[in-house]
């Protein structure tokens, strides 16, 4: 170690470069490991997590399986009675309510749940009894934060709180900080408190009626989930026998049930009706892969500089061999030195992690702490990292060093055959990774920008939305008329669906014998309401039809009056019409109610992410709705928005629960995952470029120092600085050019797979690949030039005296 410390002092620059590279690589790797660990623990904190399942519905429509979060409301009782493996079953329904005491109400996320909910999903209580907290018909348990909001410092237990225009609840428990879960809420209330709206009072007309109820089950110890899953088809048939009158399908024939393991819901299961966006496995894979590549670049840097410096330790090796050192002893010595440096790098990495933590938290959108590194599988990982990194980075240089022959060393003829080729391969690999990450970053950013504007089927610019309007009191219709007369407002519409929202309502329609459709029943049509101004406000493109009967008023629609609807092209196709125009004038029947007549077909309108296929939508023309959309005039819209908000405040003084915003912002929210992936690639791609050039900087310095005398001779015989620069630049830019040939096909294939998830996507532009390669080349040239110009500009006399 004395020899090592002396060597490190003599080569401080390269030691610091190695230490910095290893510290950055290890810090990136451990930060990502922390994030992956945090994401992987969601829903694992329940007592019997491995026996908890969500029973979800599944609609089999046109050969496509549509997963639903919801299941038939009446499910829990029959399940526990007929499936012996199920130990307990419970339901909950997600809601967003105004909670408080008059006149102060606060918008909160709340679950309505069965009495045994806290015994199945055992969220811990700080105060109260989980067995009885929801057994009380008006019981509610709240988080500490909500209790402080509602009651200040007063004892919340036993106090009452009101759902505005709804139930009065009594606080029966205080929730402890819950384990990380796919459910997000501030309160859980007894479902019976809803009175006439409760499940018991809203008896399903059909077993297949699906409201918003979500069912969870806990299996008995030792029970097989496969046995339960295998029993579900027969269970469904007993309660919902196939209907021969619906041979083509129908809700009665297309519903099945499935089991979702609760610990898998957050990361692995996406279903219609998900309460909160889950985690994204793709993001974890991108992060993990990029972090490993960053660590690989750091290891390659160490290997490259260690082999390039090997000649400087050749004399030490020769002397050690002369005094009896064996090769395996030298390999162990030099590998141990690498492990020691990696250990120092790990210590430095922990300091870097602390500094970088706020930026990393913002990047991944989650609060993360260093404390988990000391427990679970992360502790052995953190301890093993310097050992693995040191061995991987130091073993090959140790072989090179220990392979020197004493005689050749003492004669000054020591060489390391093959080491230069290995260094070239590693440099190619480093820059290939950097170039690939740059191409991926640019393509992801182009794709996100593209899908936010292309193929929407409407014009999102200048659309302003006011959401969560109360319905049924007539204020929205009056407000609409007033807003339509504001300067700067071009059109106003009311609807029950806006971009980035989901109707969560799939309907089936019967078609009469004389229809122009090839089907007698259409399934899986997503239905929502919009008034007669909806399409003009959104700028939808009419494909066929479009005229409402003269004198017809949307306000007059009820169960006794005719109903009219507009279909999207996908809905018309789903209904069996070969041409959109064939659907116009057709009458569709559902649930025995008055028919709905199709008056028009519009181009597909995409309200969800471009990851989803075009939705088959039916727009029932009806007055009212909980969303108001305004098309504003172009230009400076701040004054108009202020005027709109003032008018809304006048009609709804308690507007703390209304949400305002532009449609562009809502669409941006659909692509948070993709945008985050792009930011991750940009951040780590930049890190990869810096690390690769850090290694190149060290290699260039070593090469320039080793060729100082050669450069001096070339200067004496007339070579200029530019000649020396060209000579050295070609040596180090050639691997970068080769790296392009390696990176391009690999990243093209990876991006092709990623882009295939989208129904609307950009082409992989050749210019993107060329730009990334050119940027890497320019950065490499600048890095090389720093050393070459310094050495080439020195006086030849000094260079010829260099040893």
What role is predicted for each listed range?
Residues 32-96, 209-216, 229-231, 258-266, ...:
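Membrane-proximal extracellular/periplasmic loop immediately following the first transmembrane helix
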Residues 8, 18, 39, 55, ...:
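Generic structural signal for small/hydrophobic residues in well-ordered secondary structure
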Residues 10-35, 278-315, 343, 421-445, ...:
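Hydrophobic alpha-helical transmembrane segments of multi-pass inner-membrane transport and secretion
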Residues 1-16, 272-276, 305-332, 336, ...:
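Alpha-helical transmembrane segments of integral membrane proteins
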Residues 27, 31-34, 258-262, 338-406, ...:
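Small-residue-rich transmembrane alpha-helices
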Residues 298-342, 695-733, 787-789, 794-795:
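Interfacial "coupling" helices/loops that link adjacent transmembrane helices in transporter permeases
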Residues 111-129, 138-282, 478-673:
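Mid-to-C-terminal secondary-structure elements
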Residues 5-14, 46-47, 237-293, 311-314, ...:
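Membrane-helix entry/capping segments
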């Amino acid at each position: 170690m004395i020899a090592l410390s002396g060597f490190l002092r003599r080569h401080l620059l390269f030691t610091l470069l190695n230490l910095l590279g290893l510290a950055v690589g290890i810090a990136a790797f451990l930060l990502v490991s922390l994030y992956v660990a945090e994401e992987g623990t969601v829903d694992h904190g329940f007592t019997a997590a491995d026996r908890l399942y969500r029973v979800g519905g599944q609609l089999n429509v046109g050969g496509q399986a549509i997963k639903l979060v919801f299941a038939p409301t009446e499910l829990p009782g029959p399940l526990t009675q007929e499936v012996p493996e199920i130990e307990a079953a419970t339901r909950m329904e997600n809601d967003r309510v105004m909670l408080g005491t008059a006149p102060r109400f606060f918008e909160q996320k709340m679950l309505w749940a069965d009495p045994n909910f806290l015994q199945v999903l055992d969220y811990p209580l700080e105060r109260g009894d989980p067995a009885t907290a929801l057994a009380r018909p008006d019981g509610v348990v709240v988080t500490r934060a909500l209790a402080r909001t509602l009651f200040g410092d007063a004892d919340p237990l036993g106090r009452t709180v009101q759902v505005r225009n709804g139930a009065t609840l009594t606080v029966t428990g205080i929730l402890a900080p819950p384990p990380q879960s796919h459910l997000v809420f501030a309160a859980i209330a007894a479902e019976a408190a809803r009175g006439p709206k409760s499940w018991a009072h809203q008896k399903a007309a059909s077993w297949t009626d699906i409201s918003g109820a979500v069912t969870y089950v806990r299996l008995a110890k030792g029970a097989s989930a496969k046995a339960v899953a295998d029993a579900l088809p027969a269970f469904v048939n007993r309660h919902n026998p196939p209907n021969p009158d619906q041979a083509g399908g129908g809700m009665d024939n297309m519903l099945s049930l499935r089991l979702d393991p609760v610990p898998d819901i957050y990361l692995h299961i996406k279903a219609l009706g998900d309460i909160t966006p889950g985690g994204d496995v793709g993001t974890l894979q991108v992060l993990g892969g990029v972090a490993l590549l960053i660590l690989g670049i750091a290891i390659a840097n160490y290997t490259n500089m260690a082999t390039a410096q090997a000649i400087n330790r050749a004399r030490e090796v020769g002397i050690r061999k002369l005094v009896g050192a064996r090769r395996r002893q030298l390999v162990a010595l030099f590998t141990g030195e690498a492990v020691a440096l990696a250990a120092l790098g790990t210590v430095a990495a922990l300091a870097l992690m602390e500094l970088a933590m706020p930026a990393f938290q913002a990047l991944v959108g989650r609060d993360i702490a260093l404390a988990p590194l000391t427990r679970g599988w992360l502790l052995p990982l953190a301890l093993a990292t310097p050992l693995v990194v040191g061995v991987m980075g130091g073993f090959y240089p140790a072989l090179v060093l220990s392979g020197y022959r004493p005689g050749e060393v003492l004669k000054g003829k020591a060489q390391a055959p093959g080491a230069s080729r290995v260094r070239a391969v590693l440099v190619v690999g480093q820059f290939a990774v950097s170039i690939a990450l740059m191409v991926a970053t640019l393509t992801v950013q182009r794709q996100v920008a593209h899908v936010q504007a292309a193929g929407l089927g409407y014009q999102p610019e200048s659309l302003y939305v006011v959401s969560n309007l109360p319905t049924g009191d007539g204020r929205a219709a009056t407000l609409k008329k007033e807003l339509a007369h504001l300067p700067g407002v071009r059109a106003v519409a009311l609807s029950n669906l806006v971009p980035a929202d989901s109707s969560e309502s799939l309907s089936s329609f019967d078609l009469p014998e004389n229809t122009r459709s090839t089907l007698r029943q259409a399934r899986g049509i997503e239905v929502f309401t919009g008034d007669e101004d909806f399409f003009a406000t959104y700028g939808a493109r009419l494909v066929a039809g479009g005229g409402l009967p003269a004198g017809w008023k949307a306000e007059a629609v009820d169960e006794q009056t005719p109903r009219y609807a507009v279909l999207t092209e996908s809905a018309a196709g789903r209904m069996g019409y070969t041409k959109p125009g064939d659907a116009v004038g057709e009458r569709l029947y559902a649930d025995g109610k008055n028919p709905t007549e199709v008056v028009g077909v519009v181009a597909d309108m995409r309200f969800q992410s471009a990851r989803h296929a075009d939705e088959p939508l039916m727009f029932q023309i009806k007055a009212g709705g909980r969303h108001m959309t305004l098309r504003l005039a172009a230009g400076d819209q701040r004054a108009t928005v202020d005027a709109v908000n003032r008018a809304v405040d006048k009609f709804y003084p308690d507007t703390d629960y209304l949400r305002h915003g532009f449609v562009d912002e809502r669409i941006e929210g659909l692509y948070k995952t993709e945008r985050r992936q792009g930011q991750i690639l940009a951040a780590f791609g930049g890190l990869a470029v810096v690390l690769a050039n850090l290694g190149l900087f060290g290699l260039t310095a070593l090469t320039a120092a080793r060729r100082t005398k050669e450069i001096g001779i070339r200067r004496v015989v007339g070579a200029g600085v530019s000649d020396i620069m060209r000579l050295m630049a070609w040596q180090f830019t050639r691997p970068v050019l080769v790296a392009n040939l390696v990176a391009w096909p690999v990243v093209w294939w990876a991006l092709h797979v990623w882009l295939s998830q989208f129904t609307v996507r950009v082409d992989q532009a050749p210019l993107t690949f060329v730009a990334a390669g050119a940027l890497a080349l320019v950065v490499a040239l600048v890095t090389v030039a720093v050393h070459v110009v310094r050495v080439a500009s020195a006086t030849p006399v000094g260079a010829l005296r260099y040893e």
